[in-house]
Amino acid sequence: MEFPVARNPQVKWKTGMLNEAEEMKDADFPEIRLFHVEHQLAPDGEKEDCVGKWVVCNPENLKDFSAVGFVFGRKLYKELSTPVGLIQSTWGGTHAESWTSMKVMENNPLYADVLKQYSKERVSREKDKCKVPATLWNGMIAPMVGYTVKGNIWYQGESNSVRYEKYQEVFTNLINSWRKEWNQPDMPFYFVQIAPHYKQPAGIREAQLKTWLSGLENIGMAVVTDAADSTDIHPRNKVAPGERLAAWALAKQYGKKIVYSGPLYKSMKVNGREITLDFEFAEGGLQTPGNEPVKGFFIAGNDARFYPAEAVINGSSITLSSTYVSAPVAVRYGYGTFFRVNLFNKAGLPAVPFRTDTFAPDTYYRLFADSEIRRFPEAWQLDHGKRLYFGYAQGVGCCAMLQVWKKTGDRRYFDYVEALSLIHISEPTR
């Protein structure tokens, strides 16, 4: 079987993989073969050929191969005992539009802005030429069209976060166009929801979630909230995304009776001051590591003021409440730039971040905290009486904070901290 490893920016082991030495001890697999497509820009049209060669899977050949892709292939091989081929076609820091055929984009208003901004005539810096629409489709994917593949794995989204409101349609169009080019209308497409990070808005992960839940056949999303690093958009934990992508393939394509997704929000019921949520993929019940208190839930009333919620697990459901919210109407879990969340199912897979509200995701919030904030704290104490630190964020999570000296009011520097309580305001105050 062959699986292309598409657009994963975290391609090289030498950039730092968690427990790399141990992983390399389990990296000799003569029946796993690797094909690494060399970088090739083609802004003027589709190429018929690309450069690369098949090599055996071993520690030396893996130095320049996708760690996530390798973990994915290794898991398939161990579970299925059958030869596996992995084709890596990747270029870090690129947009989904770079990997989409121009035939899809040229007459579609959805792409008008990016076609103008990144046209080959306007892009002069060498490092930006990979962002020209269709250039990587033309040079690194089109040459493989027609080659027999079992499916695709995809790890991308960071570079599209500035246009997250368009990403669901952009990504859906990419999937459908690849399937059409290969004449495989149900070709599997498994992707990683990008890890939470202080620079990444919640909207991009929400767009990925909506893509999964849109009704497209044979797609699946791996969640990596537990592997996230607030300061590194490319977390060093490559085993979690690789094995979770493999779980989708094993369950959906090979009929393995395994759990392939973490808890997914299903429904909500309000009862006075409490909200009870039910989840799918929660057979055997919900849990937290070491039965610690649940982190990451917020509730709000009609005023759109979200407060941390106390959470009580009851089997596959969870009940939320807050002393600050007397009539809750909305819930958010892990919905923000970066959050410490800890809800899992019995299979050890993390819950999917979500929100039940329709408040604008780019609404501004005023942040309140006490004067004891430290860099990257685990929590803040809600304190309306002290405003030594304040700032604005486009959602809950880890965000830029402007330090203001209490005595003089001087603004000194930005810091990155984790916000656990936000007060909604309609407009940012300058």
Residue ranges and their predicted role:
Residues 1-359:
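Cell-envelope and extracellular/periplasmic
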Residues 170, 244, 364, 396, ...:
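Charged catalytic carboxylate motif
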Residues 376, 380-385:
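His/Met- and acidic-residue-enriched segments that coordinate or traffic transition-metal cofactors
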Residues 77-82, 399, 403-412:
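Short, solvent-exposed loop/edge-beta patches enriched in aromatic
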Residues 360-366, 404-418:
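Structural helix-adjacent loops and short alpha-helical linkers that scaffold large soluble proteins
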Residues 390-405, 430:
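Well-ordered alpha-helical segments within folded domains of soluble proteins
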Residues 423-429:
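Residue-level detector of conserved catalytic or cofactor/ligand-binding positions
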